[in-house]
């Protein structure tokens, strides 16, 4: 998929700020933007952080049927036969998206739609199969922007500093 871009980075590195900048840019270009996340809580946070309406990926794809441990009873109204009508789709908290949901999302996107996947591959993994974000990053087949500098005010907290040190293989401060 040639319209895919990945934005990744640890906590406090500016992912949300970058999402807001992209939204303003795409709106100024007159493009239709959809915002979504894998959970209701993440979608609500995305709405609050951007001031734009975000929904779950399931709602974006218009889920019908029952969501359970298998995908056998799940059907999405938005699919290859009834694709999403968006110029840009931004998905936050991508680390929680499994292979089945990613397949459904890609099936509902037409060529020319920009898909921007945002997340931290070191955060919560998906409950279902696959590590989609991590695998896409490791594939190096798509443009990846990796934010590394901590901007959030809590950047001086020992927890944030040590989390980044552990990720970088450095000695932690106790």
What spans do the regions from the language model cover?
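Conserved ATP-binding/catalytic motifs of P-loop helicase motor domains
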Residues: 1-174
């Amino acid at each position: 998929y040639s319209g895919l871009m990945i934005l990744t980075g640890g906590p406090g590195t500016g992912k949300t700020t970058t999402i807001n900048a992209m939204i303003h840019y795409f709106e100024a270009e007159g493009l239709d933007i959809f915002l979504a996340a894998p959970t209701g809580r993440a979608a609500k946070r995305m709405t609050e952080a951007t001031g734009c309406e975000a929904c779950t990926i399931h709602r974006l794809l218009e889920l019908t049927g029952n969501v359970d441990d298998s995908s056998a009873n799940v059907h999405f109204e938005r699919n290859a036969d009834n694709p999403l009508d968006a110029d840009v789709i931004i998905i936050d908290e991508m680390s929680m998206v499994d292979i089945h949901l990613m397949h459904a999302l890609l099936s509902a996107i037409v060529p020319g739609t920009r898909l921007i996947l945002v997340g931290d591959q070191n955060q919560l993994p998906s409950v279902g199969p696959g590590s989609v974000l991590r695998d896409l990053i490791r594939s190096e087949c798509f443009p990846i922007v990796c934010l590394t500098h901590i901007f959030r005010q809590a950047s001086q907290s020992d927890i944030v500093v040590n989390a980044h040190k552990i990720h970088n293989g450095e000695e932690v401060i106790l």
